[in-house]
């Protein structure tokens, strides 16, 4: 973080498991070529092996937008709800998200602390003559979300993975039909998900403190799991209002690994993991993971 402070690495928390489709899912891809009788709206596929996958950007974006609905931040000592204050769209198609204006706000924001924020220099300098020319700075995300790849059990050449669903829009005035074809993944298809949360002691200025960020860690892990539960009731991908994209998350691992683990000083068996458990069961492991990671960061690595 340079002149804005210091980030001291303490460990990682791993979220691993399966995303199981309960209904057909559509995450749109691009049409590389026009074909007579081709699908109007194909799904996204890996260009190397032509297998479908769930992009990390799609899952992370859904997690972030979900947390923006109930997350909060501390500003000037007061708790406040979040506003959609940053446009990430185009001039013609505006898309607004929440994004804190500077590092100080991002550190105290439940959304930006997990998913990151790009500083807004104009807002940061507004009304501060002595800060003219200062940069707000970026706050890198603590959570990394990988692409969810197809489960090996579904990779048999004869296995049918998708269907083409024909949908019809009807003009309310003329009653003319407008059919379209949508490709979607079949129910019960499974993908392997992995997310990694970086546990860091973040100090904005001066020497890094040795205080373990227990409160923020518990809040962040709980918020991530809460978002996953909400996604189970809402869905992932397009057309969720028409029944697409209902999913279930099944954990195979929810574990914490300290810096000592990466240095080879602790046994692998000390990680907190299990197989085939629900989000609620994962939530019960939060305190156990925090205790595993909670130690004096004497040998921590800072940037």
Q: Language model features by range: what are they?
A:
Residues 1-166, 170, 174-303:
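RNA-binding basic/glycine-rich loop and surface signature characteristic of RAMP-family CRISPR effectors
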């Amino acid at each position: 973080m340079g002149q804005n402070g210091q980030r001291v690495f303490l460990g990682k928390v791993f979220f691993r498991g399966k995303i199981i489709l309960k209904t057909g899912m559509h995450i749109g891809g691009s049409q590389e070529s026009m074909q007579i009788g081709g699908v109007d709206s194909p799904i996204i596929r890996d260009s190397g092996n032509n297998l479908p996958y769930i992009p990390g950007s799609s899952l992370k974006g859904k997690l972030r937008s979900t947390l923006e609905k109930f997350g909060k931040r501390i500003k000037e000592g007061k708790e406040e709800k979040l506003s959609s204050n940053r446009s990430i769209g185009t001039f013609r198609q505006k898309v607004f998200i929440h994004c804190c204006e500077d590092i100080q706000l991002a550190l105290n924001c439940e959304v930006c602390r997990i998913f990151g924020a790009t500083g807004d220099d104009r807002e940061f300098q507004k009304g501060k003559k002595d800060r003219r020319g200062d940069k707000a700075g970026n706050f890198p995300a603590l959570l990394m979300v990988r692409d969810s790849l197809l489960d090996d059990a579904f990779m048999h050449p004869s296995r049918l993975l998708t269907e083409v669903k024909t949908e019809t829009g009807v003009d309310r005035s003329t009653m003319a039909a407008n059919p379209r074809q949508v490709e979607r993944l079949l129910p019960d298809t499974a993908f392997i998900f992995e997310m990694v949360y970086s546990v860091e002691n973040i100090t904005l200025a001066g020497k890094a403190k040795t205080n373990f960020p227990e409160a923020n860690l518990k809040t962040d892990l709980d918020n991530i799991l809460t978002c996953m539960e909400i996604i189970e009731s809402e869905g992932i991908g397009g057309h969720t209002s028409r029944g697409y994209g209902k999913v279930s998350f099944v954990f195979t691992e929810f574990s914490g690994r300290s810096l000592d683990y990466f240095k080879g000083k602790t046994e692998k068996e000390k990680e907190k993991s299990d197989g085939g458990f629900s989000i609620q069961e994962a939530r019960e492991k939060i305190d156990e993971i925090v205790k595993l990671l909670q130690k004096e960061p004497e040998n921590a690595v800072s940037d």
